[in-house]
């Protein structure tokens, strides 16, 4: 969603577009660093706790990204956002599979996969529209209500289910 907004972000923050690409790079690098830590974190703190912490910290980081007054602060908040987003993908699959019986796991993952296939198509379209009609900060602010709803739903469904920790 942020890729198509780089020219607007760069212009508003008074930097060159090639500097603005750090908004994307910083997220990706931080995400790649945190992803392998997911297994260790879940063994230490539990799957539900880590997933909820990831979602809520992602919401906070998204809000801060929308408020960022400079490219440097935006990049710092994107690093945080990317780092806390790492566990969300594998843990969303793990929690989903724990909800369905083994014989329905293929169906559950098929529905999950549909969202991951639709997002890269809808994201840039939505990001472009939001940036053009509302403003680039809203590509980050839009994550706040969605993330809060996801955190509430996760807590409601899984608060009694937690994996053993070491």
Say what each PLM segment does:
Residues 1-38, 88:
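Extracytoplasmic
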Residues 35-166:
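Helix-loop-helix hairpins in multi-pass membrane proteins, especially solute transporters
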């Amino acid at each position: 969603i942020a890729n198509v907004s780089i020219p607007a972000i760069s212009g508003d923050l008074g930097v060159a577009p090639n500097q603005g690409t750090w908004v994307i790079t910083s997220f990706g690098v931080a995400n790649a660093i945190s992803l392998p830590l997911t297994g260790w974190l879940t063994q230490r703190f539990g799957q539900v706790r880590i997933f909820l912490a990831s979602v809520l910290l992602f919401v906070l980081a998204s809000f801060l990204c929308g408020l960022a007054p400079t490219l440097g602060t935006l990049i710092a908040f994107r690093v945080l956002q990317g780092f806390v987003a790492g566990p969300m993908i594998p843990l969303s699959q793990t929690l989903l599979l724990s909800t369905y019986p083994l014989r329905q796991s293929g169906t559950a993952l098929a529905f999950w996969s549909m969202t991951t296939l639709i997002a890269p198509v809808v994201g840039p379209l939505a990001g472009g529209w939001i940036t053009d009609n509302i403003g680039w900060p809203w590509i980050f602010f839009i994550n706040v209500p969605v993330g809060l709803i996801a955190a509430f739903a996760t807590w409601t469904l899984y608060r009694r289910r937690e994996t053993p920790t070491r």
